[in-house]
Amino acid sequence: MCIRDSCGEVLTEQETIPAAHRYVNGVCTVCGARDPVSAPCPGGKACPGSRFTDMPPASNWAHNAIDFTVAHKLFAGTSDTTFEPSARLTRAMIVMILYRLEGEPAAAAESAFTDVRSGAWYAGAIGWAAGSGIVNGVGGGRFDPNGLATREQTAAILYRYARFKGCDLDACGDLSAFADAGSVSAFALAPMTWAVGERLISGNAIGGRTLLDPQGVTTRAQFAMIMMRYILNVVQPAPEP
């Protein structure tokens, strides 16, 4: 179920991300949590990403999103000291991050995908996601776990996860604002429209134009931003004034 209650509630027995805070000047008046969007990073050791030598500066668009996802244990570093914001995500990595958000539940059964090896680090996550209707294969009984995740694949997986959680899927973005809207694949049209409507995905500046770039690859920094927006905009929208 998609929780929209007051600060301090949790999403499931396993999850620890509280539902809607009440922020005033960037700080929750109920529990004191810092708004990851509007409040400035405290800097120093208080910055969740302080251990990463390649952390973008606090003025960078990705900084707060990386802080948010690291603090909520959705992302780990690529090493003890690196995050690699520009590194590209694989399909298995996308599923693993959602699996962590869900609290890493036991899968009812292993997936039937022929290229998902039993015991692989992503096997449990893909088994859970496939059994929950969150992921489909790429055809021929394969999942392609090491394939790079495109932006439209990312939108489709997150859309199905939101449906699995019982979240509102009525948001309708205007894809006509993007010059390459016609290049969105049929399977991703509804998910991409939803993702734009929920402000999870915005355009990429390419060649002086703002494009959806649906076949472009999702980076770690981009997905950190998408996940922060998903949790704040979809799971726990701001209360009515």
Regions found by a protein language model. Give the residues of each.
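Extracellular cysteine-rich, disulfide-bonded modular repeats and adjacent stalk/linker segments
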Residues: 12-22
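Cys/His-coordinated zinc-binding microdomains
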Residues: 8, 32
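Feature responds to low-complexity, polar/acidic, surface-exposed segments characteristic
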Residues: 37-63, 71, 76-125, 132-152, ...
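Cys/His-rich microdomains that often coordinate metals
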Residues: 11, 35
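Cys/His-enriched microdomains
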Residues: 26
